[in-house]
Protein backbone atom coordinates (compact mmCIF):
# COMPACT_ATOMS: atom_id res chain seq x y z
CA UNK A 1 0.00 0.00 0.00
CA UNK A 2 1.46 3.37 -0.90
CA UNK A 3 2.28 5.99 1.69
CA UNK A 4 -0.22 8.56 0.50
CA UNK A 5 -3.19 6.24 0.99
CA UNK A 6 -1.94 4.61 4.14
CA UNK A 7 -0.85 7.56 6.21
CA UNK A 8 -2.72 10.63 5.01
CA UNK A 9 -6.33 10.69 4.00
CA UNK A 10 -6.50 13.68 1.68
CA UNK A 11 -4.81 15.16 -1.36
CA UNK A 12 -4.90 18.75 -2.47
CA UNK A 13 -3.99 19.32 -6.10
CA UNK A 14 -2.12 22.62 -5.88
CA UNK A 15 0.03 24.35 -3.30
CA UNK A 16 -1.36 27.70 -2.13
CA UNK A 17 0.87 30.60 -3.14
CA UNK A 18 1.87 33.32 -0.69
CA UNK A 19 1.76 36.55 -2.65
CA UNK A 20 4.53 39.02 -2.00
CA UNK A 21 6.89 36.17 -1.13
CA UNK A 22 8.10 35.46 -4.64
CA UNK A 23 11.79 36.03 -5.28
CA UNK A 24 13.73 35.54 -8.49
CA UNK A 25 15.62 32.57 -7.13
CA UNK A 26 15.93 30.86 -10.52
CA UNK A 27 18.04 33.70 -11.90
CA UNK A 28 20.79 32.77 -9.43
CA UNK A 29 21.20 29.28 -10.91
CA UNK A 30 23.81 28.51 -13.60
CA UNK A 31 22.45 28.24 -17.13
CA UNK A 32 23.55 24.62 -17.36
CA UNK A 33 21.71 23.71 -14.13
CA UNK A 34 18.04 24.48 -14.79
CA UNK A 35 15.09 23.18 -12.78
CA UNK A 36 13.03 20.49 -14.51
CA UNK A 37 9.49 21.86 -14.63
CA UNK A 38 8.24 19.35 -17.20
CA UNK A 39 8.26 16.02 -15.36
CA UNK A 40 5.39 15.00 -13.10
CA UNK A 41 6.93 14.72 -9.63
CA UNK A 42 4.68 11.87 -8.49
CA UNK A 43 6.77 8.71 -8.24
CA UNK A 44 10.16 10.38 -8.78
CA UNK A 45 11.45 9.13 -5.42
CA UNK A 46 11.24 5.70 -3.81
CA UNK A 47 10.46 6.29 -0.14
CA UNK A 48 12.87 4.12 1.90
CA UNK A 49 11.82 1.52 4.46
CA UNK A 50 13.95 3.42 6.96
CA UNK A 51 15.74 6.76 6.74
CA UNK A 52 18.82 7.29 8.90
CA UNK A 53 20.08 10.82 9.50
CA UNK A 54 23.68 11.06 10.67
CA UNK A 55 24.06 14.08 12.97
CA UNK A 56 27.59 13.50 14.31
CA UNK A 57 29.47 14.17 11.07
CA UNK A 58 31.42 17.12 12.49
CA UNK A 59 30.46 19.69 9.85
CA UNK A 60 28.88 22.98 10.93
CA UNK A 61 27.63 24.07 7.51
CA UNK A 62 26.25 22.15 4.54
CA UNK A 63 28.59 24.05 2.21
CA UNK A 64 31.47 22.15 3.85
CA UNK A 65 30.11 18.71 2.98
CA UNK A 66 32.22 16.98 0.31
CA UNK A 67 30.35 15.73 -2.73
CA UNK A 68 30.43 12.10 -1.59
CA UNK A 69 30.21 11.93 2.20
CA UNK A 70 30.22 8.14 2.10
CA UNK A 71 33.85 8.22 0.91
CA UNK A 72 35.06 10.18 3.95
CA UNK A 73 37.41 7.77 5.81
CA UNK A 74 36.57 7.17 9.46
CA UNK A 75 33.09 8.64 9.21
CA UNK A 76 29.95 6.81 10.28
CA UNK A 77 28.52 7.22 6.78
CA UNK A 78 31.61 5.55 5.31
CA UNK A 79 31.47 2.72 7.84
CA UNK A 80 27.81 2.04 7.07
CA UNK A 81 28.38 2.26 3.33
CA UNK A 82 31.02 -0.48 3.60
CA UNK A 83 28.71 -2.73 5.63
CA UNK A 84 25.44 -2.00 3.86
CA UNK A 85 25.51 -4.74 1.20
CA UNK A 86 26.38 -7.43 3.74
CA UNK A 87 23.85 -6.40 6.37
CA UNK A 88 20.86 -4.65 4.82
CA UNK A 89 18.01 -6.49 3.09
CA UNK A 90 17.56 -5.56 -0.59
CA UNK A 91 13.80 -5.76 0.01
CA UNK A 92 13.93 -3.16 2.78
CA UNK A 93 15.79 -0.14 1.34
CA UNK A 94 17.67 2.09 3.75
CA UNK A 95 18.58 5.69 3.00
CA UNK A 96 21.53 7.13 4.89
CA UNK A 97 21.85 10.91 4.87
CA UNK A 98 23.78 13.50 6.81
CA UNK A 99 21.83 16.32 8.40
CA UNK A 100 22.33 19.54 10.31
CA UNK A 101 19.56 19.91 12.88
CA UNK A 102 19.09 22.70 15.46
CA UNK A 103 20.27 22.12 19.04
CA UNK A 104 22.00 18.81 18.28
CA UNK A 105 25.63 18.90 19.34
CA UNK A 106 28.36 16.38 18.63
CA UNK A 107 29.65 14.37 21.58
CA UNK A 108 32.02 11.45 22.00
CA UNK A 109 29.53 9.01 20.50
CA UNK A 110 27.82 8.81 17.12
CA UNK A 111 24.36 10.38 17.07
CA UNK A 112 21.61 9.62 14.57
CA UNK A 113 17.91 10.19 13.95
CA UNK A 114 16.02 7.14 12.68
CA UNK A 115 12.67 7.31 10.90
CA UNK A 116 9.93 6.09 10.98
CA UNK A 117 11.07 4.80 14.39
CA UNK A 118 11.29 8.46 15.42
CA UNK A 119 14.28 7.75 17.65
CA UNK A 120 17.49 9.61 18.40
CA UNK A 121 20.16 6.97 19.06
CA UNK A 122 23.74 7.25 20.34
CA UNK A 123 26.43 4.57 20.05
CA UNK A 124 30.17 4.00 19.58
CA UNK A 125 31.32 3.75 15.98
CA UNK A 126 32.94 0.38 16.80
CA UNK A 127 29.39 -0.92 17.35
CA UNK A 128 28.16 0.17 13.91
CA UNK A 129 27.54 -3.36 12.63
CA UNK A 130 25.55 -4.26 15.73
CA UNK A 131 23.58 -1.04 15.40
CA UNK A 132 22.69 -1.89 11.81
CA UNK A 133 21.58 -5.42 12.72
CA UNK A 134 19.52 -4.06 15.60
CA UNK A 135 17.79 -1.16 13.85
CA UNK A 136 18.17 -1.56 10.08
CA UNK A 137 17.25 -5.22 9.57
CA UNK A 138 13.62 -6.40 9.75
CA UNK A 139 12.51 -9.26 12.05
CA UNK A 140 13.19 -12.81 10.80
CA UNK A 141 9.49 -13.52 10.28
CA UNK A 142 9.22 -10.50 8.01
CA UNK A 143 12.34 -11.49 6.08
CA UNK A 144 11.09 -15.07 5.56
CA UNK A 145 8.48 -14.04 3.00
CA UNK A 146 11.24 -12.61 0.78
CA UNK A 147 13.51 -15.65 0.82
CA UNK A 148 14.17 -17.09 -2.68
CA UNK A 149 13.02 -20.56 -3.69
CA UNK A 150 15.49 -23.18 -2.51
CA UNK A 151 17.98 -24.25 -5.17
CA UNK A 152 20.03 -27.35 -4.13
CA UNK A 153 22.58 -26.71 -6.89
CA UNK A 154 23.40 -23.18 -5.81
CA UNK A 155 26.05 -22.69 -3.18
CA UNK A 156 25.20 -20.11 -0.54
CA UNK A 157 27.28 -18.50 2.12
CA UNK A 158 25.50 -17.98 5.40
CA UNK A 159 25.97 -14.61 7.02
CA UNK A 160 25.98 -15.10 10.75
CA UNK A 161 25.76 -12.47 13.42
CA UNK A 162 26.15 -12.99 17.11
CA UNK A 163 24.05 -10.45 18.95
CA UNK A 164 25.94 -8.57 21.62
CA UNK A 165 24.45 -6.97 24.69
CA UNK A 166 25.00 -3.36 23.72
CA UNK A 167 23.21 -0.56 25.51
CA UNK A 168 22.17 1.71 22.67
CA UNK A 169 21.08 5.01 24.16
CA UNK A 170 17.84 6.09 22.54
CA UNK A 171 15.08 8.61 23.07
CA UNK A 172 11.96 9.66 21.19
CA UNK A 173 12.13 12.58 18.77
CA UNK A 174 9.45 14.81 20.20
CA UNK A 175 9.23 17.46 17.48
CA UNK A 176 8.33 17.53 13.81
CA UNK A 177 11.31 18.07 11.51
CA UNK A 178 11.57 19.74 8.11
CA UNK A 179 14.77 19.21 6.13
CA UNK A 180 15.81 20.94 2.91
CA UNK A 181 18.44 19.42 0.62
CA UNK A 182 21.39 21.81 0.68
CA UNK A 183 24.32 19.69 -0.49
CA UNK A 184 26.17 22.46 -2.35
CA UNK A 185 29.20 20.46 -3.48
CA UNK A 186 26.90 17.75 -4.88
CA UNK A 187 24.72 20.19 -6.84
CA UNK A 188 24.69 23.98 -6.84
CA UNK A 189 20.90 24.16 -7.29
CA UNK A 190 20.27 22.76 -3.84
CA UNK A 191 23.08 24.85 -2.38
CA UNK A 192 21.57 28.09 -3.69
CA UNK A 193 17.94 27.35 -2.87
CA UNK A 194 18.26 25.68 0.56
CA UNK A 195 19.26 28.69 2.72
CA UNK A 196 16.36 30.73 1.37
CA UNK A 197 13.86 27.93 2.01
CA UNK A 198 15.19 27.29 5.52
CA UNK A 199 14.70 30.96 6.44
CA UNK A 200 11.23 31.00 4.90
CA UNK A 201 10.13 27.84 6.73
CA UNK A 202 11.38 29.26 10.04
CA UNK A 203 9.43 32.47 9.44
CA UNK A 204 6.20 30.73 8.40
CA UNK A 205 6.34 28.32 11.34
CA UNK A 206 7.06 31.13 13.81
CA UNK A 207 4.20 33.23 12.42
CA UNK A 208 1.85 30.33 13.17
CA UNK A 209 3.26 29.59 16.61
CA UNK A 210 4.55 26.15 15.60
CA UNK A 211 7.57 24.56 17.29
CA UNK A 212 9.06 22.58 14.39
CA UNK A 213 12.77 22.02 13.79
CA UNK A 214 14.13 23.10 10.39
CA UNK A 215 17.49 21.95 9.05
CA UNK A 216 19.51 20.85 6.04
CA UNK A 217 20.04 17.36 4.61
CA UNK A 218 22.66 15.95 2.24
CA UNK A 219 21.97 14.47 -1.19
CA UNK A 220 18.57 12.75 -1.39
CA UNK A 221 18.29 12.52 -5.18
CA UNK A 222 16.52 14.62 -7.78
CA UNK A 223 18.58 17.81 -7.86
CA UNK A 224 16.74 18.78 -11.04
CA UNK A 225 13.63 19.12 -8.86
CA UNK A 226 15.18 21.49 -6.30
CA UNK A 227 14.16 22.68 -3.80
CA UNK A 228 13.74 19.25 -2.27
CA UNK A 229 12.03 19.12 1.11
CA UNK A 230 11.26 16.25 3.50
CA UNK A 231 8.72 16.59 6.30
CA UNK A 232 9.19 14.13 9.19
CA UNK A 233 6.15 14.11 11.51
CA UNK A 234 6.80 13.31 15.16
CA UNK A 235 3.75 11.02 15.02
CA UNK A 236 5.10 7.48 14.49
CA UNK A 237 1.97 6.42 12.61
CA UNK A 238 2.85 8.78 9.75
CA UNK A 239 5.62 8.39 7.22
CA UNK A 240 7.80 11.18 5.88
CA UNK A 241 6.48 13.33 3.03
CA UNK A 242 8.85 14.20 0.17
CA UNK A 243 8.32 17.31 -1.92
CA UNK A 244 10.15 18.77 -4.93
CA UNK A 245 10.15 22.11 -6.75
CA UNK A 246 9.53 23.95 -3.50
CA UNK A 247 10.13 27.68 -3.76
CA UNK A 248 9.69 30.44 -1.13
CA UNK A 249 6.15 31.34 -2.20
CA UNK A 250 5.03 27.74 -1.58
CA UNK A 251 6.45 27.37 1.93
CA UNK A 252 3.47 28.85 3.78
CA UNK A 253 1.16 26.60 1.76
CA UNK A 254 3.15 23.51 2.81
CA UNK A 255 2.99 24.56 6.45
CA UNK A 256 -0.77 25.16 6.28
CA UNK A 257 -1.74 22.15 4.18
CA UNK A 258 0.75 19.47 5.27
CA UNK A 259 2.15 20.36 8.69
CA UNK A 260 -1.12 21.70 10.09
CA UNK A 261 -3.76 20.15 7.83
CA UNK A 262 -2.25 16.69 7.28
CA UNK A 263 -2.74 16.89 3.50
CA UNK A 264 -0.40 15.85 0.70
CA UNK A 265 0.09 18.46 -2.01
CA UNK A 266 -0.07 16.43 -5.19
CA UNK A 267 1.80 18.78 -7.54
CA UNK A 268 4.86 18.73 -5.24
CA UNK A 269 4.70 15.14 -4.00
CA UNK A 270 7.59 12.87 -5.05
CA UNK A 271 6.12 9.65 -3.67
CA UNK A 272 3.77 7.24 -5.42
CA UNK A 273 0.16 8.40 -5.75
Swiss-Prot record:
UniProt-listed InterPro entries: Aim32/Apd1-like, Thioredoxin-like_sf
Top-level taxonomic group: Eukaryota
Gene3D superfamilies per record: Glutaredoxin
Membership in a protein family: Belongs to the AIM32 family.
Entry protein name: Altered inheritance of mitochondria protein 32
Lineage: Eukaryota, Fungi, Dikarya, Ascomycota, Saccharomycotina
Amino acid sequence: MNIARRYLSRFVEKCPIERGCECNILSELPNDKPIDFEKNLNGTSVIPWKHLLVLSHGFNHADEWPSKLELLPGSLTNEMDLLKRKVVSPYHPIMISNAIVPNVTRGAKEKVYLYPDNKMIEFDIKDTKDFMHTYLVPPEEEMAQFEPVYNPFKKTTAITWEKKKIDFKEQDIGKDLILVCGHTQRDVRCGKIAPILVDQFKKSLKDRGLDVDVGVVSHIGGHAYAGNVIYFPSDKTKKSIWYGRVFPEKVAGIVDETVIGGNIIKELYRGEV
